[in-house]
From Swiss-Prot:
Span list, region Disordered: 177-197
Record's protein name: Cytadherence high molecular weight protein 3
Domain of life: Bacteria
Region described as 8 X 3 AA repeats of P-V-V: spans on this chain: 160-456
GO biological process: adhesion of symbiont to microvasculature
Region (9 X 3 AA repeats OF Y-D-Q), start-end ranges: 98-251
UniProt organism field: Mycoplasma pneumoniae (strain ATCC 29342 / M129 / Subtype 1) (Mycoplasmoides pneumoniae)
Length: 672
């Protein structure tokens, strides 16, 4: 091999080694060359012994000639020999060679090695390799499935052995059966009595103290309120069998008594409370001081007997009892008196009939007062149904008569009440007719009628024609399309850096549009933004034209109008913007600077600046379709759509377009 070929191999080796090391970092690779000095990255499968070329991703034939890079000696691959890092009996790291075909271990010198005390890196004895793998093991043992890898160390080495003839339940028990968890010894079971009452650790006040000490002002208010108002502690302590010994309810609520906690709710252990109760009760009666104190208490007993000597006092009480009975007998006597009372009551009612007549006179004296007359109208409506015969004049003032008729019909028989009522009714009727002064009602109606004509807008109608001639609308209004053609051409000259450009138009609106489009020819609009200006502008695909006379890329105007690129308010969301009939051109929801709905005026849906201003068209707009947000476009991946067009197909808002372009927020995500 010449030096030229050697240099060529070294150069190829540098490239291939870097590539293979990046693609296969965990594989031991041997580099060799074939008879034509072609470089190969060689790898031997430890299970099969096959040789692969990594750069070609192919298996090489077993007799393929391969040579070392720096010499002409052939490369010999030992058949299925695996190097292993093991630890001997002294825990020293040793590298051993395992031959799968012969199922033996060799040391680095090629000598057969006894691995009875050796273990591998996973602490598995190397003897297990000899027991589970190799041709001898497969020949001695007969299993339902052949050993994987033709004697390669089994992947299940070290796992529990499962009897293949056992039932599935037994196999599962052999595989996954674990020793039962160690039970707690008896010395850990607390058999002592519950401690005495301590208010610091009282179950009733503990939660309140924890709430006061750990109160978090930033926590949700309803969570804190829930812990306070809906707490079940009071109920559980009184009625929960797991919290207290409910056989002794008073003891559970006595602050000086012992109580059972949930740990001692067992009925067998609950009996342990009884001797604790007896212990404090014994010294109390044993106290000797109690006996002499009881002797004077017996002497004071006769003193108590002297107090009940008030026996004569109840005797007069018995005498007063008949005295009380006497007025009780008098009480039934007024019952006939009550019967007599309604009879005289009818007489003052008859006297009451002349009384309302002076009241009517009082009403007549203030004739000018409007509210009193209104009350008479209300009485007129109530009294009309009662008197059937008197149709014409009973209406103004029969108020006293019907009021009297209603109680009399209920209390007294109809025979006596009818003649009394008939006699007074004609008298007030005759007096009422002159008092009512029916012409009074007519002038009131006359007053309402003149009130209506001043409300009529006749003088306002006279004012309107006066305003109309003053308006200068016809002087500057654009004439209709039919009259535009004969008008003389309006011309305007715009001076740009490229020279003078003259535009001839016949329509004022077209002139304004072309003037606005020519305003974008200056360099400030077409040049690439400087680094410090790159983030002051929205991306080119996010621009929305706002006014005819406002240049789209006027840098001073954009710098001075930061409100156009601020985060939108609640009113400027797509839900609210649909009422304006305007659809945003390209809304990028990852870029809040593009949500400038306030600048969307006087333009229809999907108006893009590139189509409206053909002279101002940067290169980025050629991929506008890809950069534009497809949230509002329902025809995104339709095969019939044109991916190069800048405007999606027209959809009428009456055909459900708005509901699909601006869906309800609940359809965006369930968490909204």
């Amino acid at each position: 091999m010449t030096d030229k070929e050697r240099a060529k191999l070294a150069k190829a080796y540098g490239k291939l080694a870097q590539k293979i090391q990046k693609s296969y970092p965990d594989i031991n690779v041997v580099y060799g060359r074939d008879a034509k000095n072609k470089l190969h990255a060689l790898y031997q499968d430890p299970e099969t012994g096959n040789i692969f070329s990594l750069e070609k991703r192919k298996q090489l034939p077993a007799d393929y000639p391969l040579f070392e890079l720096d010499s002409d000696e052939p490369i010999s691959f030992a058949p299925k020999i695996i190097p292993l890092t093991a630890f001997d009996g002294n825990n020293n790291e040793v590298i051993v060679q395992y031959d799968q075909v012969n199922n033996t271990f060799y040391d680095q010198d090629g000598n057969v090695l006894d691995v009875s005390g050796y273990r591998d890196g996973e602490n598995i004895p190397l003897v297990d390799y000899l027991n589970y793998g190799g041709s001898t093991a497969s020949a001695d043992t007969t299993t339902s499935e052949p050993l994987s890898g033709e004697g390669y160390p089994d992947i299940d080495a070290g796992l529990p052995v499962v009897d293949p003839d056992a039932t599935p339940e037994q196999q599962a028990d052999q595989l996954f059966g674990l020793d039962p968890l160690p039970q707690a010894p008896d010395e850990y079971q607390d058999t002592t009595a519950p401690p005495a009452y301590d208010q610091t650790f009282d179950q009733a006040t503990y939660d309140q103290q924890a709430y006061d000490q750990n109160y978090d002002p930033n926590a949700y208010y309803d969570q804190q309120a829930y812990d306070q108002s809906f707490d079940q502690q009071a109920y559980d302590q009184a009625y929960d069998a797991n919290a207290y010994n409910t056989q002794n309810y008073d003891q559970a609520h006595d602050p000086n008594a012992y109580y059972d906690s949930q740990a001692y709710s067992d009925p067998d252990q609950a009996s342990a409370v009884a001797p604790i109760e007896v212990a404090p009760l014994q010294p109390e009666p044993v106290a000797p001081v109690v006996e002499p104190t009881a002797v004077p208490i017996v002497e004071s007993a006769p003193i108590v007997e002297v107090t009940p000597t008030v026996e004569p006092t109840p005797t007069p009480v018995v005498e007063t009892a008949p005295v009380v009975e006497a007025p009780k007998v008098v009480e039934p006597t007024p019952t006939p008196v009550v019967e007599a009372t309604p009879a005289p009551k009818v007489e003052p009612k008859v006297v009451e009939q002349p009384q309302p007549t002076p009241v009517t006179v009082e009403v007549d004296s203030p004739k000018v007062e409007i509210p009193k007359v209104v009350t008479a109208k209300v009485a007129l409506q109530v009294a009309q149904p009662t008197p059937v015969p008197a149709v014409p004049k009973v209406a103004p003032q029969p108020t006293p008569a019907p009021v009297v008729v209603q109680p009399t019909a209920v209390v007294q028989p109809v025979v006596k009440a009818e003649p009394k009522v008939v006699t007074p009714t004609p008298a007030p009727q005759v007096v009422v007719t002159p008092q009512v002064a029916t012409p009074k009602v007519t002038p009131k109606v006359v007053q309402t009628t003149p009130a209506v004509p001043p409300v009529v807008v006749q003088p306002e109608v006279v004012v309107q024609p006066i305003i109309r001639p003053t308006q200068p609308e016809p002087e500057w209004k654009p004439s209709p399309a039919s009259v535009v053609e004969p008008q003389p051409c309006q011309s305007a000259c715009v001076n740009n850096e490229s020279g003078a450009i003259t535009i001839h138009t016949t329509n004022r609106s077209l002139l304004l549009e072309k003037l606005a489009s020519l305003g974008h020819l200056h360099d400030a609009s077409t040049r690439t933004p400087l680094p410090h200006e790159r983030y002051q502008l929205a991306p080119p695909s996010e621009y929305v034209a706002t006014k005819y006379n406002e240049p789209l890329f006027n840098l001073p105007a954009i710098r001075n109008s930061w409100a156009r690129f601020t985060r939108p308010t609640v009113e400027s969301t797509p839900i609210a913007s649909r009422f304006t009939g305007v659809t945003p051109m390209a809304v990028n929801y990852r870029n809040p600077a593009s949500l400038n709905f306030d600048s969307l005026n006087s333009f229809g849906a999907y108006r893009s600046p590139s189509s409206f201003y053909p002279l101002r068209r940067p290169l980025e707009l050629s991929s506008l379709r890809r950069n534009r947000s497809s949230f509002f476009n329902t025809h995104r991946f339709d095969l019939g759509s044109n991916y190069t067009s800048f405007t999606p197909r027209y959809r009428s808002p009456l055909r459900g377009g708005l509901s699909q372009r601006f869906p309800l927020r609940s359809s965006w995500s369930k968490e909204f």
